[in-house]
Amino acid sequence: MMHVFEVYPKVNIFLKILHKEGAYHKLISRMCLVKDKLKDIISVKSALSFSLKGDFDCPLEENSLFKALQILKNFLKSKNFSHSAIKSLDTLAIEVEKNIPTQAGLGGGSADAGGLLYHLNHIFDWRLSLEELYSMGSLVGADTNFFISQHKSANATSYGEVIENFEEEPLENRLEIYAPNHVFCSTKAIYQAYKPETCFSQTKEWLKKPSLECLKTCDRSELNDLLKPALLTNQALRDIESELGKEWFFSGSGSAFFRLKNTQKGANETHCQQ
């Protein structure tokens, strides 16, 4: 068997930090899939032994695809799946054509892992429920469940792992991404530099707001609470951001920016109501 599938990045239309609970911050966000030039292509086939190939920037044990497979294997064991079903994961040859940059706020590693879990469930006809896939996805990484969901637009809550479809006109073909070369943002450093400015109470209002309205009425620092700490901790990012027009928005903890296609400088005229 040979299966090939494409994986697209996400952007955060808005990302609002609520409060810290345990080691991590609770948040609310709107994630949208972006089908533009950036995509990873993953091929999965049966082989004599396991292999995972791709231009990855981390050791195998830290790779999100490898992590997803270990979590999946343990899950199948806990559900008493047959020995042959579990063994089938040990003879997969997985190859990734990697184009989505990492440390860019685009969910690159999570996209690959989420896509793999979603597609393996179909390839092997395991009939795992979305909830079961989500329980594994949240162990891989906070953004993974958005990619498992296959939604084009969704609200993410809790630590980012609770996903709810958001019904709206999809923006997947209307957005373009700018991912600066050689500028990497450390999510950990940015969260450490984050300082809450006000007590955030507008959760429900944000989660109801259409993405297009957010982009047309707010500027990038109003939409993303991590922009300021990212600029504080990264000089290269600061240099790039200062040159960008108002139509550009910041995704995740960076370093990528995105905008509506065919928007000009100064396209955002009205002020965001927070």
From Swiss-Prot:
NCBIfam families: ispE, PRK04181.1. Its EC number is 2.7.1.148. GO terms for molecular function: 4-(cytidine 5'-diphospho)-2-C-methyl-D-erythritol kinase activity; ATP binding. PANTHER family: 4-DIPHOSPHOCYTIDYL-2-C-METHYL-D-ERYTHRITOL KINASE, CHLOROPLASTIC. This is 4-diphosphocytidyl-2-C-methyl-D-erythritol kinase. It holds the Pfam family GHMP_kinases_N. ATP binds at residues 101-111. The keyword ATP-binding applies. GO terms for biological process: isopentenyl diphosphate biosynthetic process, methylerythritol 4-phosphate pathway; terpenoid biosynthetic process. Belongs to the GHMP kinase family. IspE subfamily. It is an enzyme of class 2 (transferase). Catalyzes the phosphorylation of the position 2 hydroxy group of 4-diphosphocytidyl-2C-methyl-D-erythritol. Pathway: Isoprenoid biosynthesis; isopentenyl diphosphate biosynthesis via DXP pathway; isopentenyl diphosphate from 1-deoxy-D-xylulose 5-phosphate: step 3/6. Keywords: ATP-binding, Isoprene biosynthesis, Kinase, Nucleotide-binding, Transferase. InterPro entries: GHMP_kinase_C_sf, GHMP_kinase_N_dom, IspE, Ribosomal_Su5_D2-typ_SF, Ribsml_uS5_D2-typ_fold_subgr. The active site is at 10, 143. It catalyses: 4-CDP-2-C-methyl-D-erythritol + ATP = 4-CDP-2-C-methyl-D-erythritol 2-phosphate + ADP + H(+).
